[in-house]
Curated annotation (Swiss-Prot):
One of its GO terms (biological process) is negative regulation of biosynthetic process. GO terms for cellular component: cytosol; nuclear membrane. Belongs to the GFRP family. InterPro entries: GFRP_sf, GTP_CycHdrlase_I_reg. This is GTP cyclohydrolase 1 feedback regulatory protein. Gene3D superfamilies: GTP cyclohydrolase I feedback regulatory protein GFRP. The keyword Cytoplasm applies. Its main location: nucleus. It comes from the Eukaryota. Keywords: Cytoplasm, Membrane, Nucleus. The keyword Translocase does not apply. It is found in: Nucleus; Nucleus membrane; Cytoplasm, Cytosol. PANTHER family: GTP CYCLOHYDROLASE 1 FEEDBACK REGULATORY PROTEIN.
Amino acid sequence: MPYVLISTQIRMETGPTIVGDEFSDTQLMAQLEADKRTVLGNNFSEYCVNEPPRVTLNKLEKLGYRVVSMTGVGQTLVWCLHKE
């Protein structure tokens, strides 16, 4: 899977960082040391790390991913990364 989306809440710049959904590459999620969780009331799971986005972005860069775009949506920051 060449694309990855990660996000965090602006008020939570120091983490946690959401790094994937229930359909994400499990090998990549293991490399990021992400835990799969389901928040009460949601009918989907997501992978999360207890690190700031900067640390996660650095890990993904070492794995060959590059930031394609970044945006703020309300109180959420989102990065899109791609691996050639």
